[in-house]
């Protein structure tokens, strides 16, 4: 299976079933047999196409009179991302993506992607170009001014650097700062109320705290437990709504609430 085929299958799960990108892509890569370079390419295609979805649709919709079915739409997005944002040569982006299309739509996909490749884009708005909803751009303009708002969104579209803790756990630097801000002492009891996937909980446990990690979804709580076990750390987990914590007052010395993000992909 090619990197593009793995990416397409993952994108269809994400877009069709509302699945989490990271939970879909990891197992898909493990099953794929791809080498490291192709794994990186598949990862870039999945996260990049998801991140730039609005912009990819704008690139495609100039040449589409009737909305395509969801599976074809996903394939067109994948091709448009390669052409518009991934720096893939046009012949490869078009040819390899068309090869993934069912015969009944292969000519359509080929025609649309060739036009995307050959036609300069005039973006209808900065928010379309940056692939954010209008309301996010407008709110940031109100708070920061237009130039700083655009700069902020451009920065958020950049792939973050990979940061690895001393114990080998891959965790964004900003998440590491959140855990460090708790300043726990050894033996203190800490509740990490919105814990999945477990990076902050395991960092607190590694610092000597007794940690209870909670998440509203049982599957997400199990993910915390799995990550803690992999690191050899004792973290108790509970599936619980942090707005109604099942603990009496005074149970913990500290409570960390790194509340769930907005889900905008930034």
Where do the protein language model's features map onto the residues?
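S-adenosylmethionine
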Residues: 1-266
């Amino acid at each position: 299976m090619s990197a593009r085929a793995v990416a397409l299958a993952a994108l269809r799960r994400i877009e069709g079933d509302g699945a989490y990108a990271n939970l879909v892509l990891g197992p898909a890569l493990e099953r794929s047999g791809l080498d490291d370079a192709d794994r990186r390419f598949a990862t870039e295609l999945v996260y990049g196409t998801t991140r730039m979805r609005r912009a990819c649709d704008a690139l495609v919709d100039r040449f589409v009179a009737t909305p395509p079915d969801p599976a074809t739409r996903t394939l067109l997005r994948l091709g448009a991302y390669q052409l518009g944002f991934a720096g893939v040569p046009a012949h490869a982006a078009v040819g390899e993506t068309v090869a993934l299309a069912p015969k009944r739509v292969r000519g359509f996909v080929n025609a649309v992607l060739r036009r995307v490749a050959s036609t300069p884009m005039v973006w209808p708005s900065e928010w379309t170009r940056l692939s954010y909803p209008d309301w996010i751009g407008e709110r940031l303009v109100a708070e920061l001014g237009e130039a700083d708002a655009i700069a902020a969104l451009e920065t958020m579209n950049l792939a973050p650097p990979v940061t690895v803790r001393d114990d080998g756990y891959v965790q964004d630097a900003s998440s590491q700062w959140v855990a460090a801000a708790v300043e726990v002492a050894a033996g203190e009891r800490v509740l990490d109320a919105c814990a999945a996937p477990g990076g902050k909980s395991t960092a607190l446990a590694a610092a000597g705290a007794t940690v209870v990690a909670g998440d509203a979804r049982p599957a997400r709580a199990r993910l915390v437990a799995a990550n803690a076990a992999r690191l050899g750390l004792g973290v108790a987990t509970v599936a619980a709504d942090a707005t109604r914590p099942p603990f009496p007052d005074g149970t913990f010395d500290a409570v960390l609430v790194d509340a769930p993000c907005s889900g905008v992909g930034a």
